[in-house]
Amino acid sequence: MQLPPLSAESRFRPAVYGLIHALVDAACVAAVVRASRGSYLGDLSTFWTVAGYDLLAFGLEFPLGLVVDRLHLTRFSMIIGTAMAAVVLAPGPIPALATMIVAGVGNGLFHLGAGGLVLRSAGGRAAPAGVFVAPGALGLGLGMWMGRTGRGATFPIYFALAFAVIALITLDKPALKWEPSKGSHALPRSGSGGQSPPAPTRSLEPPKGSQEKLALLPWLVLLMLLLVSVAVRSFVGFGACFQCPGGLAVAIGLPVAAFLGKLLGGMMADRLGWLRASTGALLLSLPLIAFSGGSLVLALPGVLLFQSTMAVTLVAVYGLMPRWPATAFGLPCLALVAGSFPTFFPAGKQLFGRWTFVLLIAFSAAALALALCRLARHGLARDRRFMGRRTGGARATPG
């Protein structure tokens, strides 16, 4: 079964949100790094300010996502998050702690709102999610450069974000039609729900009622496989960056490689099949990352391949909970910060090593492959999204 074609609006919207995503990330990171370097509150250091920002921006996305979905606030969350990103760049002194909190919460709210709307409008495809998340890597790189060097004017980003807030309020009202209808927030029900565009043919959301409790176990197992795969990739990704030497080439090369990987990964997965493209990319990245030895010639292609699986993972998690798009976007973000947390400390960095990376990448690929195969067996592979062109829908779905 072929997926229906996306409307022009559904193709255009992820790109617009992706551009705002880059601006939001650049603003938040630049403001946090600059504030931490130039203003201290007690023993608040640059390290803890940036770490606190990461924990707020990514760690809170799961609980905030539950609230956003429950109250149907995806569009509101996106607008408020964009406005908060503009606030941290507003003229005038802002304490480092306040900057960290406003930037972290604002960044998370934008991710949940815009990411949830993109997932809901993607029609079961991975490419729109990749188009949305990819520019964030460029924004992160730009924000780190601006924050560390103190160079680059923040006024253009501030005014661009202010304009984006006005545009989202006045011009983006069609996004309201993607909000779930009343009563569709009940997580233990199946189906695509609400007024969302075409979604996976079946949902693996945990069932409702004591007589169906056994079905909760495979749902949780699939979800944990996807999230553990993300957490492991987060740890290895930080390790790959840690091994690279400093300098302008790394500051530019790593964000560009991550951008291209996320952008092209979703497109290639939709074309070649999610399982084939995602696990293949991870396995191809294994020798490049594990044995790069800090060489950018090997590390950058490895990072590109490594990052190409994020879009598939996001849409696969959404396939498990299609009535909860913001939560589905927030859970992988929580896994990202969980995987990166050990790298905040010297003891965690001691785990970096080529054979550790070999084992972890292989484990991540196996977890992702197992999850995608099980999703296919449960009716989410009646087209070419999961297994590719050779294993089309009817054979991939049990009769």
Can you annotate each of these PLM segments?
Residues T154-K173, W355-R374:
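Symmetry-related core transmembrane helices of the 12-TM Major Facilitator Superfamily/SLC fold
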Residues R125-G147, F329-P346:
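Glycine-rich segments within core transmembrane alpha-helices of 12-TM secondary carriers
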Residues G108-G123, Q307-P322:
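Intracellular juxtamembrane helix-capping segments at the cytosolic ends
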Residues F47-V68, I252-L264:
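Central cavity-lining transmembrane alpha-helices of secondary-active solute carriers
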Residues D69-G81, D270-L283:
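Cytoplasmic membrane-interface "Motif A"-like loop-to-helix N-cap segments
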Residues R276-T313:
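C-terminal transmembrane helical hairpin of 12-TM major facilitator-type secondary transporters
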Residues G59-P91:
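Conserved MFS/SLC helix-loop-helix module at the cytosolic interface between two early adjacent transmembrane helices
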Residues Q2-G38, F47, E212-V236:
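Pair of pore-lining "gating" transmembrane helices in MFS-fold secondary transporters
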